UniProtKB/Swiss-Prot annotation:
<dbReference type="InterPro" id="IPR011993">
    <property type="entry name" value="PH-like_dom_sf"/>
</dbReference>
<dbReference type="InterPro" id="IPR034676">
    <property type="entry name" value="Akt1"/>
</dbReference>
<keyword id="KW-0723">Serine/threonine-protein kinase</keyword>
<keyword id="KW-0945">Host-virus interaction</keyword>
<dbReference type="GO" id="GO:1990418">
    <property type="term" value="P:response to insulin-like growth factor stimulus"/>
</dbReference>
<comment type="similarity">
    <text>Belongs to the protein kinase superfamily. AGC Ser/Thr protein kinase family. RAC subfamily.</text>
</comment>
<dbReference type="InterPro" id="IPR000719">
    <property type="entry name" value="Prot_kinase_dom"/>
</dbReference>
<dbReference type="InterPro" id="IPR008271">
    <property type="entry name" value="Ser/Thr_kinase_AS"/>
</dbReference>
<feature type="binding site">
    <location>
        <position position="200"/>
    </location>
    <ligand>
        <name>ATP</name>
    </ligand>
</feature>
<protein>
    <recommendedName>
        <fullName>AKT kinase-transforming protein</fullName>
        <ecNumber>2.7.11.1</ecNumber>
    </recommendedName>
</protein>
<keyword id="KW-0067">ATP-binding</keyword>
<dbReference type="InterPro" id="IPR039026">
    <property type="entry name" value="PH_PKB"/>
</dbReference>
<feature type="active site" description="Proton acceptor">
    <location>
        <position position="295"/>
    </location>
</feature>
<keyword id="KW-0808">Transferase</keyword>
<dbReference type="GO" id="GO:0106310">
    <property type="term" value="F:protein serine kinase activity"/>
</dbReference>
<dbReference type="InterPro" id="IPR017892">
    <property type="entry name" value="Pkinase_C"/>
</dbReference>
<feature type="domain" description="AGC-kinase C-terminal">
    <location>
        <begin position="430"/>
        <end position="501"/>
    </location>
</feature>
Length: 501
């Protein structure tokens, strides 16, 4: 059966549901839904409340009083999402799909009857319309119109407009870094500067299905306005007639995974340096952007030419095999999953501190805290097994890792309202001056042996050995940037981090 798109709306990121900060937040609809697990793809009954602020929260049991409402298992927002109806993998299914940063995230639900599904769809649409009106009333004044031939969005004052429209022809395509359901990530070289970037290419149809028109690309704006020394910056974003393209920094000091593999284990001091930079970046995402990163793992950490951390945003939603009996029960990187993610208790910021615990354990112990080739056994270890440490590890490091790898997110270090501040105050980081971390005043413990931003010695040899072709043979699918009147869905999707290339 075809998916049917109902609505696309701007608003909050999916990752952090809005909370009851005002007394006039009302419940619009409540009832039982079956929610499909995000990783272990079984269906679980959940009692959901939809509120007029966009909050969509689920419980194992129907909450009887206000106290019980304070700790939902699932907590996210229906804002800025597509809502789709489908009859697969079960009848009366609906899917909420959202672009968080540049990664497409989905949640899947089903109900017993078409009428029930229609009721939920109508309720969600009602909430969406209210949020849309609110946003329109409070939205910053923007000059320029969708038909503006420059194709450039009015930027915040701090950002210069691009002097020319960026197109796909300005890059050499070197290596496929990742592929998934919604698109691909390619290592590219900008012809004019010789600099390397990661280009994430998303198929437009998965973000705007059928003839729905996107009100705005809020997440694109979030990315543009994110400025943090240890987060991958967005250099350009542009579109072709069927794709959205995000061009992001690709740090050339090599993946941390590469350096750790070579050295097997890092000293506690070196791990402390990298850990501090990661904490600084996650603190910014949580407190300034209200975003949970969700995907912290060694492969997503790179070093820049000076040896500072860069957290990447090259993630793609992994593809399942098939619906039905042959469907793999799991997709993603299982070794890094927090217990609450495995149990499908939709997670908050504490999931990032679990991820920090796993990567810092790898750095200081030279192996993963939990590992088994058999996924079922691995899940059991993550959920049940106590953490073990090598005898050589110092007491402060043990204390930090024990706190970060607590199974219960509410008991986890950083799991309380203080979030990152709790980790910053831990005795393992006692000598760290956090403002100095942010300002890159700490000297990196290892400096990559690269001479410039175009030095490729830490790249896989095959990265630079040959160019890859990404233009499909079909003329209709040309990768040329097309005129604004031919792309009504994303009339203002164009961005450059500076006026020059």
């Amino acid at each position: 059966a075809r998916e049917e798109t109902l609505i696309i709306i701007p608003g909050l990121p999916l990752s952090l549901g809005a909370t009851d900060t005002m007394n006039d937040v009302a419940i619009v609809k409540e009832g039982w839904l079956h929610k499909r697990g995000e990783y272990i793809k079984t269906w679980r009954p959940r009692y959901f409340l939809l509120k007029n602020d966009g909050t969509f929260i689920g419980y194992k049991e129907r909450p009887q009083d206000v106290d019980q409402r304070e700790s939902p298992l699932n907590n996210f927002s229906v804002a800025q999402c597509q809502l789709m109806k489908t009859e697969r993998p079960r009848p009366n299914t609906f899917i909420i799909r959202c672009l968080q940063w540049t990664t497409v995230i989905e949640r899947t639900f089903h109900v017993e009857t078409p009428e029930e599904r229609e009721e939920w769809a109508t309720a969600i649409q009602t909430v969406a319309d209210g949020l849309k009106r609110q946003e329109e009333e409070t939205m910053d004044f923007r000059s320029g119109s969708p038909s503006d031939n420059s194709g450039a969005e009015e930027m915040e004052v701090s950002l210069a407009k691009p002097k020319h429209r960026v197109t796909m022809n300005e890059f050499e395509y070197l290596k496929l870094l990742g592929k998934g359901t919604f698109g691909k990530v390619i290592l590219v070289k900008e012809k004019a500067t010789g600099r390397y970037y990661a280009m994430k290419i998303l198929k437009k149809e998965v973000i705007v299905a059928k003839d729905e028109v996107a009100h705005t690309l809020t997440e694109n704006r979030v990315l543009q306005n994110s400025r943090h020394p240890f987060l991958t910056a967005l250099k350009y974003s542009f579109q072709t007639h069927d794709r959205l393209c995000f061009v992001m920094e690709y740090a050339n000091g090599g993946e941390l995974f590469f350096h750790l593999s070579r050295e097997r284990v890092f000293s506690e001091d070196r791990a402390r340096f990298y850990g501090a930079e990661i904490v600084s970046a996650l603190d910014y995402l949580h407190s300034e952007k209200n975003v949970v990163y969700r995907d912290l793992k060694l492969e997503n950490l790179m070093l820049d030419k000076d040896g500072h951390i860069k957290i990447t945003d090259f993630g793609l939603c992994k593809e399942g095999i098939k619906d039905g009996a042959t469907m793999k029960t799991f997709c993603g990187t299982p070794e890094y999953l927090a217990p609450e993610v495995l149990e499908d208790n939709d997670y908050g910021r504490a999931v990032d501190w679990w991820g920090l615990g796993v990567v810092m354990y790898e750095m200081m112990c030279g192996r993963l805290p939990f590992y088994n080739q058999d996924h079922e056994k691995l899940f059991e270890l993550i959920l049940m097994e106590e953490i073990r440490f090598p005898r050589t590890l110092g007491p402060e490091a043990k204390s930090l890792l024990s706190g970060l790898l607590k199974k219960d997110p509410t008991q986890r270090l950083g799991g309380g309202s203080e979030d990152a501040k709790e980790i910053m105050q831990h005795r393992f980081f006692a000598n760290i001056v956090w403002q100095d971390v942010y300002e890159k005043k700490l000297s990196p413990p290892f400096k990559p042996q690269v001479t410039s931003e175009t030095d490729t010695r830490y790249f896989d040899e095959e990265f630079t050995a040959q160019m890859i072709t990404i233009t499909p043979p079909d003329q209709d699918d040309s990768m040329e940037c097309v005129d604004s009147e031919r792309r009504p869905h994303f009339p203002q999707f164009s961005y450059s981090a500076s006026g020059t290339a």
